[in-house]
Curated annotation (Swiss-Prot), chain B:
Pfam families: GatC (PF02686). Its EC number is 6.3.5.-. The keyword Nucleotide-binding applies. Keywords: ATP-binding, Ligase, Nucleotide-binding, Protein biosynthesis. GO terms for molecular function: asparaginyl-tRNA synthase (glutamine-hydrolyzing) activity; ATP binding; glutaminyl-tRNA synthase (glutamine-hydrolyzing) activity. It catalyses: L-glutamyl-tRNA(Gln) + L-glutamine + ATP + H2O = L-glutaminyl-tRNA(Gln) + L-glutamate + ADP + phosphate + H(+); L-aspartyl-tRNA(Asn) + L-glutamine + ATP + H2O = L-asparaginyl-tRNA(Asn) + L-glutamate + ADP + phosphate + 2 H(+). One of its GO terms (biological process) is translation. This is Aspartyl/glutamyl-tRNA(Asn/Gln) amidotransferase subunit C.
Length: 488, 95, 475
């Protein structure tokens, strides 16, 4: 058993008993990274020196009895989360050399706990994409099959956890960017309720939808990480003041009488047979555990994807306007005048998908189209929100597949934006409604992982974790990706 | 086409993006497809529906009027491609 | 055909908060470039704004003082445009739901009171500053980026440049009174843009609107409008048409000229700011703010009449600026003759302020110094006319009055013997006037007093001079 293959709670036991040191744990992961990284390309930056130094500090903490659940645990952070003194590129040429002078609030929280940052992970440029192919630097490969995508946009974080490059990772989810790659890589990924985790320091894609969340190897770890990263932040006006629960207290196997909603809309067109079957088997598992399965309908959910593309692109067009080469980032070398400098800089710095969304968003907000597109989408957002509220009158959580397909081939959808957008069809509605959602591995289809999505009411992460944990205990997902070799 | 070539050119200018003729062509086709797709929303009657700009219904989030130290100028300017005399430098602007 | 002008004004006023609108950087004017900057006001990727509560309170205060309706529900929006002084490439402002709307101010022109409507007041952030001194590029300083502003948009209710001038004066006065802005145009804390069109008298249709920029003082606004209205009428009378454009006031040439702007039409793509939540001003909050409002000009004016016995004219002038009124009250606290103080403020003080173009708080004379000067007169140390000389020196140098009197030897000659010798000499040197006086010409007396003053360089005690002169002449 290699240290790198352990979960947070397993590592925690060893660290607490001082059977291993944080330095040993860190070195084990750094070795693992050297071994598998050339195959999967999950990371943009590896912070080896910083990690080793932090590991020594963590060991000090443990020695002095100042340790907590995450002290000495190595993490990988998506490269759109601001890390002071460490490049934060968003996988964009625009920010290739950008070094933030400040930490995101979540990073501050992790560092305070004594977490060890191993590196920054690859993503679709500015988190726009579902395959991590839109990175300006590298294409991350799915550890289960190197010819396939890990999903996106947090594909680097998902692949890193699947390949044991860290004990846990942080990602961001705007339309499915944590849950979908978690599903495709066979790991646990959660998007918390909008406003639960501070967005301060998360490079904005679509401000009203973005949310930071964890990738972990099991549900228990998800609860542990959540305990640390949530909480009100006075730097984020949309972060909520709620009492901090202990999410590990929800990790119970009992779900008797819990009402689980199954929406027919989540089994619609485009779903692969293998995915459908695996998820239906999972529903049976939950039923056998004593949950009540209720058929529900969320009729407006089919409008979530078009509404999402308008809202997210509109906000993105504004959020990404600041990249002009004046204060930071890429700047053009040759231009005629100021306006030309803006245009050349931005055209050189952004990749195609980013430009496509900026164009769509600018169009949707422009004079004469605002009401027809942006305002319309916000109204549809109201309908979807109400839809979920109605559904949650009948059930406690809603389950379904995270993604309509298993991991697809690299290049397969690269030239068809609409086909790519469909990868998020089951996840975007959750962002539109600001709800929490988790993806947990529930089986394999053709040797590739299938994810089960569990959606809850606002701030009902506890109940989601309860269902996820009960399912996990009853249906252990022990498979490991074979394409990279050398797992447990 | 849901969007014309000249509209694409106009939007590109608004967004401060520069495209070659081929790219304009490509964007016109792709954006048209996407716009056709999002036009699906027009199937819905939203006449009496209020738009939702903020999903979590909170209001009046303020900070007190307190001054805290600003950031060291070296750090503020650290990522600037061009700087001079403690300032960011841009091409000459004629007003 | 007779034409009339239609004038609307947009005023931006910086609010007097300690910190910026969305971050904790100081709002202090000046400072080395980019030293009042943090990741938030620099718009670094990932940063978020948090609204300064005082900004809302100050805007509501201004709204209440300007008779506005205060919105119960208000929100922030993004105004998108690219410019190097705008770090996020959008300005956080308010679009369709401003904090205050539908107010008015009353102005007085030719003895008549006129209401000028205020369409809206909204809050927003200021941009940074571009410095153009460099030869091969422009430099950007973001110290000012994120300083809170209110934008006050008038209805196009003004028809003459004089009305516009009166409106601005009144508005500035009220903003100063409410203590929400110091309104210093030279530091850019008050900025004015104006829209003007002309139309035939009697017509209800509006003419083509011209926007005027680079207006650095209220007088400049007035002069630019005068020029621009004449220009537009001339164009129309010559059969031409007005082209919608932005023109720039050229102060030295005294003309407006077209600005070299980029051709493209603005499309600000406003949308609700997702990073900030709505603002709800409850009735309770509004009343709390109303209670915190300082005394308004007309109340102060009435109080000055009742409490200090000032004539209405004096009270009006003294309260026309809050700073002047404050100065007055500080003086009166230590000096029990309000009318004397008001005479000085309206007289010498105002004259020198006009001459130098300085505001009362930019003058080195403090209320305590003026009181000292007045006491020097009362105690017979200096004469009233010498006091004016001393005051001028105080105004210029900020020296204490007694120091000036000492340094320049300006003390009155109140020694009877000394004065009598001088007077005797004057009588000998002016036989003609003495003759006239004795023949009943009272005016001659004045001339002789003048000669005594001249001989003593104004230092002769006037009462004593009169007394001795009469004695000597009747000898």
């Amino acid at each position: 058993m290699e240290l790198y293959s352990l979960t947070i709670h397993e590592l925690r036991e060893l660290l607490k008993k001082r059977e291993v040191s944080a330095l040993e744990v860190t070195k084990s992961y750094l070795e693992r990274i050297k071994e598998v990284e050339p195959k999967i390309d999950a990371l943009i930056t590896i912070t080896e020196d910083f990690a080793l130094q932090r590991a020594k500090e963590a060991d000090e903490k443990i020695k002095n009895g100042e340790d907590t659940d995450l002290t000495g645990i190595p993490v990988i952070i998506k490269d759109n989360i601001s890390t002071e003194g460490i490049k934060t590129t968003c996988s964009s040429k625009m920010l290739e050399n950008y070094i933030p002078p400040y930490n995101a609030t979540v990073v501050e929280k992790l560092l305070e706990e004594g977490v060890i940052i191993l590196g920054k992970s690859n993503l679709d440029e500015f988190a726009m994409g579902s395959s991590t192919e839109n990175s300006a630097f590298k294409t991350t490969k799915n550890p289960w099959d190197l010819s396939r995508v890990p999903g996106g946009s947090s594909g680097g974080s998902a692949a890193a956890i699947a390949a044991d490059e860290a004990a846990f990772a942080l990602g961001s989810d705007t339309g499915g960017s944590i849950r979908q790659p978690a599903s495709l890589c066979g790991v646990v990924g959660m998007k918390p309720t909008y406003g639960l985790v501070s967005r301060y320091g998360l490079v904005a894609f679509a401000s009203s939808l973005d949310q930071i969340g964890p990738f972990t190897k099991d549900v228990t770890d998800c609860a542990i990480v959540l305990n640390t990263i949530i909480g009100h932040d006075s730097k984020d006006s949309t972060s909520l003041k709620i009492d901090k629960p202990d999410y590990t207290s929800y990790l119970k196997e009992d779900i008797k009488g819990l009402r689980i909603g199954v929406a027919k809309e989540f089994f619609g067109e485009g779903i692969e047979e293998g995915v459908k079957e695996t998820v239906q088997e999972s529903i049976k598992v939950l039923q056998d555990l004593g949950a009540e399965i209720i058929d529900i309908s969320i009729p407006y959910v089919e409008y979530a994807l078009p509404a999402y593309y308008i809202i997210a692109s509109a906000e993105a067009s504004s959020n990404l306007a600041r990249y002009d080469g004046i204060r930071y980032g890429h700047i053009a070398e040759k231009y005629e005048d100021l306006i030309d400098m803006y245009m050349v800089t931005r055209s050189e710095g952004f990749g195609k998908e980013v430009k496509r969304r900026i164009m769509l968003g600018t169009y949707a907000l422009s004079s004469g189209y605002y009401d027809a597109y942006y305002k319309k989408a916000l109204k549809v957002r109201t309908l979807i929100k109400n839809d979920f509220e109605k559904a949650f009158e009948k059930c406690d959580v809603i389950i379904g597949p995270t993604s309509p397909t298993v991991a697809f081939k690299i290049g397969e959808r690269a030239n068809d934006p609409l086909a790519m957008y469909l990868a998020d069809i089951y996840t975007v509605s959750v962002n539109i409604a600001g709800l929490p959602g988790i993806s947990i591995p529930c089986g394999l289809s053709d040797g590739l992982p299938v994810g089960l999505q569990i959606i809850g009411r606002h701030f009902d992460e506890g109940k989601i974790l309860n269902v996820a944990y009960a399912f996990e205990q009853a249906n252990k997902f022990n498979a490991k990706p074979q394409a990279i070799g050398g797992a447990r | 086409m849901a969007i014309s070539r000249s509209e694409v050119e106009h939007v590109a200018k608004l967004a401060r993006l520069k495209f070659s003729q081929e790219e304009i062509e490509e964007f016109t086709v792709q954006l048209s497809k996407i716009i056709d797709y999002v036009n699906k929303l027009n199937e819905l009657d939203t006449e009496n529906v209020e738009p939702t700009a903020h999903i979590v219904p909170i209001h009046n989030v303020f900070r007190e009027d307190e001054v805290k130290p600003s950031m060291d100028r070296d750090k503020i300017l650290m990522n600037a491609p061009y700087k001079e005399n403690g300032c960011f430098k841009v091409p000459k602007i004629i007003e | 055909m007779k034409y009339e002008a239609v004038i609307g004004l947009e005023v931006h006023a910086e609010l007097l908060t300690e910190s910026k609108i969305f971050c904790s950087c100081t709002t202090k004017f000046g400072g080395e470039p980019n030293t009042h900057v943090c990741p938030v006001c620099l718009g670094l990727p990932g940063t978020l704004p948090v609204l300064n509560k005082k900004v809302v309170e100050y805007a509501v205060r201004a709204g209440l003082a300007l008779n506005c309706t205060i919105a119960n529900f208000s929100k922030m929006d993004r105004k998108n445009y690219f410019y190097p002084d705008l770090p996020k490439a959008y300005q956080i402002s308010q679009y369709d739901l401003p904090l205050c709307s539908n107010g008015y101010v009353e102005i007085e022109v030719d003895g008549k009171v006129k209401k000028i409507g205020i369409k809206r007041i909204h809050i927003e952030e200021d941009a940074g500053k571009l410095l153009h001194e460099n030869t091969d590029g422009s430099l950007v300083d973001y110290n000012r980026a994120g300083v809170p502003l209110i934008e006050i948009v008038s209805e196009p209710d003004m028809t003459t440049p004089e009305e516009a001038y009166q409106y601005l004066t009144k508005l500035k006065n009220i903003l100063e009174y409410t203590e929400v802005s110091d309104c210093k145009m030279q530091e850019g804390s008050l900025r004015v843009d104006t829209n003007v069109s002309v139309r035939p008298v009697g017509s209800t249709e509006l003419g083509t609107k011209i926007e005027l920029k680079n207006l650095n003082s209220f007088r400049a606004v007035q002069k630019a409008l005068e020029y621009e209205i004449k220009r537009q009428i001339k164009v129309l009378e010559e059969g031409g048409t007005i082209v919608q454009e932005t023109r720039r006031w050229n102060e030295s040439k005294g003309i407006t000229e077209p600005m070299r702007t980029k051709e493209e039409a603005h499309d600000y793509r406003y949308f609700p700011e997702p990073d900030l939540v709505p603002i709800i001003v409850t009735d309770e909050w509004k009343e709390e703010i109303r209670k915190s409002l300082p005394e308004m000009p007309h109340h102060k004016r009435e109080r000055f009449i009742a409490e200090y016995g000032l004539p209405e004219y004096d009270a009006k002038i003294i309260t026309s600026s809050k700073k002047m009124a404050d100065f007055f009250e500080k003086c009166v606290l230590e000096y029990d003759s309000p009318k004397t103080v008001s005479n000085w403020l309206m007289g010498e003080f105002s004259r020198l302020m006009n001459e130098t173009g300085k505001e009362i708080d930019e003058v080195p004379v403090t209320p305590q110094m003026l009181v000292k000067l007045l006491k020097l007169i009362d105690n017979g140390v200096i004469s009233g006319s010498i006091a004016k000389t001393v005051f001028e020196e105080m105004f210029g140098t900020g020296k204490e009055p007694e120091v000036i009197v000492e340094e320049k030897g300006l003390k009155q000659i109140a020694n009877e013997n000394e004065l009598r010798e001088i007077i005797k000499k004057v009588i000998v040197e002016n036989p003609k006037s003495v003759e006239d006086y004795k023949n009943g010409k009272e005016k001659a007396m004045g001339f002789l007093v003048g000669q005594v003053m001249k001989a003593t360089k104004g230092k002769a005690n006037p009462q004593l001079t009169n007394q001795i002169l009469k004695e000597e002449l009747s000898k």
